[in-house]
A protein has these predicted regions:
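Hydrophobic alpha-helical
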Residues: 142-157, 225, 244-306
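Flexible loop/hinge segments that line or gate small-molecule binding clefts
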Residues: 46, 146-187, 205, 301-309, ...
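Short beta-strand elements at the ligand-binding edges of bilobed clamshell
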Residues: 113-115, 171-195, 208-210, 241, ...
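Short, solvent-exposed amphipathic alpha-helices that sit
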Residues: 91-106, 188-192, 216-236, 250, ...
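Hinge/cleft segment of the Venus flytrap/periplasmic-binding protein
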Residues: 13, 40-78, 209, 213-216, ...
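Hydrophobic alpha-helical segments within soluble ligand-binding/sensing domains
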Residues: 80, 123, 180-206, 250-252, ...
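Extracytoplasmic "Venus flytrap"
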Residues: 48-103, 107, 112-125, 142-145, ...
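Bacterial lipoprotein signal-peptidase II cleavage site
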Residues: 27-42
């Protein structure tokens, strides 16, 4: 994945730019809040919580159904298969799946779903099963970036278009898949570094709780963080890096080891909220107080943003999981023969002590 200065240049023609604008409006207006699910009234904050597309600039690549080799189809008559990668204990995955299901229901589209339960071999067989059950279109939230050849070959044989969300498949756009919809993970890492620099004063030792190996999210969030620290705060030293596998339990275990081996640590960059919340639990268990160690995380879950309100977390960089409207908007346009961007970049917000309490309703 390229950096922001390149990745925001996604759309080249006025029609495609108009499509991106429509996607942004649709994604925002279709966002669901927890109050909606309970039948309550949607808050203003929740109404603003939908995904917004980064303003497009000239220079990006697009895809059409003719170039891809698929067939035109009315989305309302299609069967869409959705493959979720991870156990839905993580609020990000819960919100992501709910968004896909809500949008399919809103549009009256038949949806088949499968959850790989964090097992890559199962995700491959899940998608193959979705194809066997008659999926005309696929939306995939990949667990890993590599190893997708069996699925790509099977989908190509049936001329089934694929849209990937959140994590990238290492394959060729407009040949193996249509579009990739995600945040700019390098930029998320940079913004996390900015918040860490502000919180620590740009001096001292910090640790990184890495996400799981084998996907672009971990690689790029790490890259962005380190680049920004090197650029703006050479006095801030990364002295510890270990994977927490994007889970709260592992994040807690790694942090317990960290504070034993590096008692002078000043900050922890957790590459998702769940690991960050695990770090908070470890600090509480060790008798630390809020603010003793600065924690910066990425995602925007309600528990993490509450952690900012409570003083345990210094900042949260949002990674919005509400992909449903954008994914279906892309599929709808594509199956009608319109050009769609090969990369659709989401514009994320952030939570700090200045806005966390006010914007808590936007969290998921």
């Amino acid at each position: 994945m390229q950096r922001t200065t390149h990745r925001s240049r996604l759309l080249t023609r006025p029609a495609v730019i108009a499509l991106a604008a429509a996607m942004a409006v649709t994604a925002t207006s279709c966002a669901k809040s927890e109050d909606d699910a309970a039948g309550g009234k949607k808050s203003t904050a929740a109404a603003d919580a939908g995904q917004k597309v980064v303003t497009p600039e000239p220079g990006g690549k697009t895809c059409t159904i003719d170039a891809y080799g698929g067939k035109r189809i009315d989305l309302k008559d299609a069967t869409v298969g959705f493959s979720q990668s991870e156990k839905e204990a993580n609020p990000f995955r819960i919100a992501e799946t709910q968004s896909i299901e809500d949008e399919a229901a809103e549009r009256g589209v038949k949806l088949l779903t499968a959850n790989a339960q964090s097992q890559f071999s199962k995700q491959i067989s899940d998608v193959q099963d979705l194809l066997a059950k008659g999926a005309d279109l696929l939306v995939i939230a990949p667990l890993n970036s590599d190893g997708w050849d069996p699925v790509l070959q099977a989908a190509a044989a049936k001329k089934v278009p694929i849209v990937t969300i959140d994590r990238k498949i290492n394959a060729t756009a407009c040949k193996d898949y249509v579009s990739f919809i995600a945040s700019d993970f390098v930029e998320q890492g940079r913004r996390a570094a900015d918040r860490m620099i502000e919180a620590t004063g740009g001096e001292g030792e910090v640790a990184i709780l890495l996400g799981s190996a084998g996907n672009n999210v971990t690689t790029e969030r790490t890259q962005g963080f380190k680049e920004r620290v090197a650029e703006k705060a050479p006095g801030l030293k990364v002295v510890f890096e270990q994977t927490g596998d994007f889970t709260r339990e592992k994040g807690q275990q790694v942090t317990e080891q960290l504070i034993q081996s590096k008692p002078g640590i000043k900050g922890i960059y957790a590459e998702n909220d769940e690991m960050g919340l695990g770090a908070v639990a470890a600090l509480k268990g060790a008798g630390k107080k809020a603010g003793d160690i600065e924690i910066v995380t990425v995602d925007g879950t309600r528990n993490a943003v509450q952690g900012v309100v409570d003083g345990w977390i210094s900042g949260v960089i949002e990674s919005n999981p509400r992909f449903g409207p954008l994914a279906f908007q892309t599929l709808d346009a594509f199956t009608q023969g319109k050009e769609v961007p090969q990369d659709i970049v989401i514009q994320d917000s952030a939570y700090s002590p200045d806005n966390a309490e006010r914007d808590l309703g936007k969290a998921y």
